[in-house]
Amino acid sequence: VLDYEGTPEYTLCCIVTDKEEIGSVGATGMASHYLENTVAELYACTADYCELAVRRCLRNSRMLSSDVSAGYDPNFASAFEKKNSAFLGRGICFNKFTGSRGKSGSNDANPEFMASLRKIMDDAGVAFQTAELGRVDLGGGGTIAYLCAKYGMNVIDSGIPVLSMHAPYEIISKVDLYEGYRGYCAFLQGAKPVE
């Protein structure tokens, strides 16, 4: 958001939350009313505040839920489906769905949002890849995307592939980190109403 060039036509924001690893609970977790209360407070600064406007604002939002993605590790190849895995050095990763036991407890991004995201990345020349978080019924994980999707907004998980996630030493590619930065900037620059 800080590197946005020019004046945005539409409102842009970056929301930082914690407690994701324990279910996004508490006053600063995404399961709280933090987001909707903040939007309501902003709307309250206008002359024509109403609850329906807050709900419409949330519904018409587009979000990249930024987290890391499991990078393919050849030493533990059985934990991945190679053709549905993120690889280091291939750019920012988009996870259409997360969860475990199939798609349980996840958000599943719609194809129209995926298409608009691909266009934004292609137009900006950003290297990107799509993946899932490990082999079905073996891997998996959760993020905050499903908590924001409950408002009807378009949400997808995005982030940098990482090897040895949650280990004392994690490994990422500097290329992916840079493409992630470029991807987030392109997403903000390409902000437009949901069609």
Predicted regions and their residues:
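Acidic/histidine-rich catalytic neighborhood of metal-dependent amide-processing enzymes
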Residues: 1-93, 140, 189-195
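His/Asp/Glu-rich mid-to-C-terminal helical/loop segments that flank catalytic regions of hydrolases
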Residues: 2-13, 160-195
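Conserved active-site and cofactor/substrate-binding residues in soluble primary-metabolism enzymes
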Residues: 30-38, 108-116, 139-142, 175-182
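Short alpha-helical interface elements
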Residues: 39, 142-146, 153, 172-173, ...
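Noncatalytic linker/hinge segments flanking ATPase motor cores
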Residues: 53-62, 102-113, 169-175, 195
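Active-site-adjacent substrate-binding region
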Residues: 69-76, 80-169
